[in-house]
């Protein structure tokens, strides 16, 4: 726990700021922010499902209703494996929500601390461009879950006669969720419907980020709250890069949100000093609070 946070804080302080060339549909990293062109209610619905992954007491309360979603299945205990919840949602389809860091679990913390860029896992490597690298710890978190996720998503798609699959995550769960979003789009019939990722760290190198833009750029919605430092790590100095088009809520926990085009937009989150605590990271995203320590259990949709 201490090791993971210490390394992450140090690397956050050393993060570099610069623009980057991006794929055609992703706009330019020097473009000015624009109004968020998405359905904001879907962000709120996704946020409450992200929060519920931190709620161990309701982990197997199948049938639990959260907004328009019903809990179908759960795996992982947040210690050996990150918790993943599957829901049936009117707006999101089969929703896959992945837990963020459990700071009381050394294994969970180590997922955040294993910073080495590595080749993609053999299950999906052939679908990605040569030279793709992803962070070792995040990929380990995903490969602990991937087979269970695929088996149960296929099962519930058939049972519920549902073609849409949405991936949701916060923090470490967002990093794992980005890998899951791309993998589902590449290997699962009907692909990805939407992805909602809150407090997303950098996951892969520029080749990975460009491929994400090409394959799921129009389906990916990721959000930064205020001065949250987590999205600034791992640093670009280690070869990591974000995909395009994030939503920045600034000031934190407010309703002032804009979409920042391109990769590593020069007008966005990197223009303000980071606050190296978890207040903004575990903040209010589209009227719903997400966080292992600050969020409510059972999760509550809206209210802020």
From Swiss-Prot:
Subcellular location per UniProt equals: Secreted; Secreted, Cell wall
What is the residue range of the signal peptide feature? 1-19
| InterPro entries hit by this protein | AB_hydrolase_fold (IPR029058), Fungal_lipase-type (IPR002921), Sec_MonoDiacylglyc_Lipase (IPR051218)
Catalytic site positions: 171 (nucleophile), 228, 281
- Major enzyme class: hydrolase
The chemistry this enzyme catalyses reads: a monoacylglycerol + H2O = glycerol + a fatty acid + H(+); a diacylglycerol + H2O = a monoacylglycerol + a fatty acid + H(+)
Q: What is its EC number?
A: 3.1.1.-
Query: Which terms under GO biological process does the entry name?
Result: lipid catabolic process
**Cystine pairs:** 55-297
A Pfam family annotated for this UniProt entry: Lipase_3
What pH behaviour does activity show? Answer: Optimum pH is 6,0.
Q: Which UniProt keywords apply?
A: Cell wall, Disulfide bond, Glycoprotein, Hydrolase, Lipid degradation, Lipid metabolism, Metal-binding, Secreted, Signal, Virulence
Entry GO MF terms? hydrolase activity; metal ion binding
- Major site of localization recorded for this protein: secreted
Residues annotated as glycosylated:
102, 161, 253
The annotated thermal profile of this protein reads: Optimum temperature is 15 degrees Celsius.
**Which is one Gene Ontology cellular component term of this protein?**
extracellular region
Return the similarity comment. Answer: Belongs to the AB hydrolase superfamily. Lipase family. Class 3 subfamily.
Biological function: Secreted lipase involved in Dandruff and seborrheic dermatitis (D/SD) probably via lipase-mediated breakdown of sebaceous lipids and release of irritating free fatty acids. Shows activity against monoglyceride and diglyceride substrates, but not triglyceride substrates and does not exhibit regio-selective production of diacylglycerols. Hydrolyzes both 1,2- and 1,3-diacylglycerols. Also hydrolyzes distearin, dilinolein and dipalmitolein.
Q: PANTHER family attached here? A: ALPHA/BETA-HYDROLASES SUPERFAMILY PROTEIN (PTHR45856), FUNGAL LIPASE-LIKE DOMAIN-CONTAINING PROTEIN (PTHR45856:SF24)
Please give the name of this protein: Secreted mono- and diacylglycerol lipase MDL2
Annotated organism of origin: Malassezia globosa (strain ATCC MYA-4612 / CBS 7966)
Source organism phylogeny: Eukaryota, Fungi, Dikarya, Basidiomycota, Ustilaginomycotina
